[in-house]
Amino acid sequence: MAEFKYDIVKTFGTVSENDNGWVKEVNLVSWNEREPVYDIRVWQENHEKLGKGITLTEVELKNLKNLLNTMDI
């Protein structure tokens, strides 16, 4: 398995937390020393382990925000 690096540049907040202490967060993350992207992902509390997630560019995040604003929720 290939090794990768990540740096959480900014944490925006927690979406949810499960009973095992894993949290779903919205962060700005630099993967492998690249330009930071917006990231929604499940993390272990200390950020040493991570689960599946999604990364979004600024344009994609703005599009998602616009889409969510049109939803009747």
Locate the predicted segments by residue.
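Positively charged, low-complexity terminal tracts
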Residues: M1-I73
